[in-house]
Amino acid sequence: MAFLAASHPLFLMISESVNIIIITLAIFLGIIGIIGCVLPVIPGPPISWVGMLILYIWGHGTNSSGEPMSTRLLIIWCVITAVVTVLDYLVPSYLTKKSGGSVYASRGALAGLLIGLLFFGPLGIVLGPMLGAFLCEIIFARKSAGESIVPALGAFAGFLCGTGLKLIASGMMMYYIFVYIR
């Protein structure tokens, strides 16, 4: 009595089912990663990178020429993911401070993003950080409305830069997920 050989029809059927699950999971993680670039509670680029990692680990990472995904590509995208994730935390606060904002503007931008997303959807994601920074500068830093506009715009620019970097990174990783699906 022998175990299933690799050429046995049942083995091939199970193998094909696993392939479909792995590929679906990688694509799903890539999509969640892109969504996570805009939603502050989901770490977008790391989730996209895990999608690439899954293809690599299970050996499904081959492009249309039959070349496998290289370890080098995976490491490069791991480093890019780490850098983009760190920059996403540093850039908004840096631009807020460079524009004369206080720590309240940075916190207000994050609070505005969360509240804006919750109550106003996509428009809240865009306008929430700016409005949150503006209001927190007025209320907590006790600045005038005129003095609060520039830091609010700085917080908004920081949010856009961080989100843009994450979208580019996750979008490129999604591209590689599709390239390396065989």
Pin down the residues of each PLM region:
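Helix-adjacent hinge/juxtasegments
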Residues: S70-G116
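Transmembrane alpha-helix interface/packing and boundary motifs in multi-pass membrane proteins
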Residues: G30-W49, L113-G124
